[in-house]
Amino acid sequence: MAAKTSNLVALLLSLFLLLLSISSQVGLGEAKRNLRNNLRLDCVSHPSPPPPHRSMAPPIFVPPSTSHKGQGP
């Protein structure tokens, strides 16, 4: 029974350490991204103008095929 308890404790401890490691890596990634975004915003003196507005092109009309099923073109 002591061996099962020992294995269970080791498993839970390993899972906890894995979770802690993953969460710290995610936190570091977010911190780096935020720092990069803040530095990028500091370098920009004024926002760039929005892209020009494009009008929507009309859809292309494709006539239905004149060939019948089972017959050639």
From Swiss-Prot:
Cellular localisation: Cell membrane; Secreted, Extracellular space, Apoplast
Motif SCOOP motif mapped to chain: 59-73
Coiled-coil positions:
none
Gene Ontology process terms (BP): defense response; defense response to bacterium; response to bacterium; response to cold; response to ethylene; response to jasmonic acid; response to salicylic acid; response to salt stress
What is the annotated signal peptide range for this record? 1-31
- Chain intervals with Polar residues compositional bias: 64-73
Residue ranges for motif SxS motif essential for MIK2 binding? Answer: 65-67
Stretches the record annotates as Disordered: 44-73
| Tissue specificity | Mostly expressed in seedlings shoots and leaves, and, to a lower extent, in roots, stems, siliques, seeds and flowers.
Q: Can you cite an annotated GO cellular component? A: plasma membrane
Loss of this gene results in the following: Slightly increased growth and fresh weight.
Record carries keyword Membrane: yes
State the oligomer form and interacting partners: Interacts with MIK2 (via extracellular leucine-rich repeat domain); this interaction triggers the formation of complex between MIK2 and the BAK1/SERK3 and SERK4 coreceptors, and subsequent BAK1 activation by phosphorylation.
The record's family statement is:
Belongs to the serine rich endogenous peptide (SCOOP) phytocytokine family.
Protein name in UniProt = Serine rich endogenous peptide 14
The coding gene here is PROSCOOP14
